[in-house]
Amino acid sequence: MPMTDAFQVRVPRVSSSTAGDIAASSITTRGALPRPGGMPVSMSRGTSPEVALIGVYEISKILTAPRRLEVTLANVVNVLSSMLQMRHGMICILDSEGDPDMVATTGWTPEMAGQIRAHVPQKAIDQIVATQMPLVVQDVTADPLFAGHEDLFGPPEEATVSFIGVPIKADHHVMGTLSIDRIWDGTARFRFDEDVRFLTMVANLVGQTVRLHKLVASDRDRLIAQTHRLEKALREEKSGAEPEVAEAANGSAMGIVGDSPLVKRLIATAQVVARSNSTVLLRGESGTGKELFARAIHELSPRKGKPFVKVNCAALPESVLESELFGHEKGAFTGALNMRQGRFELAHGGTLFLDEIGEITPAFQAKLLRVLQEGEFERVGGNRTLKVDVRLVCATNKNLEEAVSKGEFRADLYYRIHVVPLILPPLRERPGDIPKLAKNFLDRFNKENKLHMMLSAPAIDVLRRCYFPGNVRELENCIRRTATLAHDAVITPHDFACDSGQCLSAMLWKGSAPKPVMPHVPPAPTPLTPLSPAPLATAAPAAASPAPAADSLPVTCPGTEACPAVPPRQSEKEQLLQAMERSGWVQAKAARLLNLTPRQVGYALRKYDIDIKRF
């Protein structure tokens, strides 16, 4: 093996006894190494194949043990010090810039070992890294690579200090160096070639271990950083979402005003329904906020941020509705000058809200059914089939069950859209929300008109007692009309139209109760009077009837008796029919509404010869 050119440099020497003390301070075994069976192995000046094999075996056990890399490397150099006739040993792992990142040593005093990182022979290490070849220096005191590092190797004991360094490589990349130094007296007892081969084998094992440790450390750092990022994002999302969730729980985030139990349950159901892509059917009287709930479901769903497209099916004739929903090709009909996308295409990836779906004709129902079943359609005048991904929300105030029984509405379409029905209660069933709604509408009016009007407590009481057959929409109109015509900034009962006999509800429903339009949400405000047990001719005892809530006391609007807060009392048969329709023709549910037993309801059905509707 070629040696480096050297030149003599005089350095201070100390006694042999001192050098021996320094070397012995970190060498645990000198002269013999235990065999696996317990017998010692005699050490020679060179590294024999037997000793090398045992050394590789011992070092491989250290390298595969689950310890920190610093501890592992320190154990390796300690084993080397027990096997080789060496004074000092060093494993230096480099960082990406080529500077010492981790140094494990043996043979130095604790004081010197603590400063070794700042005194490593950097020039020698750089040459090993640059050439990727072992470096053997017979006399470090005479080699310029070690100039300035004489103190690092200690007193030479009247002999020459030699240096052997090999690169630590993995995947053809130098990751550091493994080096030792020893006393060389110039005789043939020292076989540098054998030591270089042995140290190269050890360095290769160390290189693989360092590479694995760095990969694990890199993955760990990446996972820790990713965890920190996710935790930070979660904290930010949680801090930003907590008010949003709280608002959604009471409906304010969705624009829904009301904190009655009915509204809270409906909002909670809407939040659950919004998570899926199931079709939703919103049912309720006109003015109960079906479009508001449809938009809320869209905003709470994963499709938030995608299009929300709405179509009023009752406002368009069939020919126009088909073109509106499916689009048309250029020249499909007179006036079709350009191709036009339909609402289904515009809502791709989002939500399509079909209001008043109960008003479409049976012929168009078949076309709509195909889109709901297959998710595909053709534009008017076209022959290319288009596929869309749309979440459908429908709404109606029509009795679809009755329409199905009369053949006015297809049963297959009914079952297709009646996947998740949400029944919106009329305003008269939640009078406790009226004050909050009224204040909300008045605040909007004030903001639009830059006013500061208020509702007096007696005025709120008047609103709570009114019937509002037009529900929330009528309440909003009432507030706007009253605020517009009020003479003062504070609205009083005398400012309402019913005080002067101009109540729209009284004019609309004068002398008769409104005709039920929904099987589940009747417009009549009168709570059902419990039917009497058989025979039904006698009234039920007063104790059997639940006391009406204060919110639903039968009072009339002030100033006129024509405003029917309570429409005329229904007959027992009408009450029974209404309860059955509200309960979906389930006798047990109807019995609970009437405060009767299912057996009594069954008797009443037979008495009045009422057939059970089945769908």
UniProtKB/Swiss-Prot annotation:
Entry keyword ATP-binding: yes
Domain of life: Bacteria
Pfam families from the UniProt entry: GAF (PF01590), HTH_8 (PF02954), Sigma54_activat (PF00158)
Region (C-terminal DNA-binding domain): 573-615
Biological process terms in GO annotation: nitrogen fixation; phosphorelay signal transduction system
Induction of the gene: NifA transcriptional activity seems to be controlled by both the general nitrogen regulatory (ntr) system and the O(2)-regulatory (FNR) system.
Organism the protein comes from: Azorhizobium caulinodans (strain ATCC 43989 / DSM 5975 / JCM 20966 / LMG 6465 / NBRC 14845 / NCIMB 13405 / ORS 571)
Function according to Swiss-Prot or TrEMBL: Required for activation of most nif operons, which are directly involved in nitrogen fixation.
DNA-binding interval(s): 587-606
Residue positions binding a divalent metal cation: C498, C503
Subunit and interaction comment: Interacts with sigma-54.
GO function terms (MF aspect): ATP binding; ATP hydrolysis activity; DNA-binding transcription factor activity; metal ion binding; sequence-specific DNA binding
InterPro entries, sorted: AAA+_ATPase, GAF, GAF-like_dom_sf, HTH_Fis, Nif-specific_regulatory_prot, P-loop_NTPase, Sigma_54_int, Sigma_54_int_dom_ATP-bd_1
Domain annotation Sigma-54 factor interaction: ranges: 256-484
Gene3D superfamilies: 1.10.8.60, 3.30.450.40, Homeodomain-like, P-loop containing nucleotide triphosphate hydrolases
Region annotated Inter-domain linker, chain positions: 485-572
Alphabetical keyword list: Activator, ATP-binding, DNA-binding, Metal-binding, Nitrogen fixation, Nucleotide-binding, Transcription, Transcription regulation, Two-component regulatory system
Residues that hold ATP according to the record: 284-291, 347-356
Domain GAF: 68-210
Record's protein name: Nif-specific regulatory protein
Lineage: Bacteria, Pseudomonadati, Pseudomonadota, Alphaproteobacteria, Hyphomicrobiales
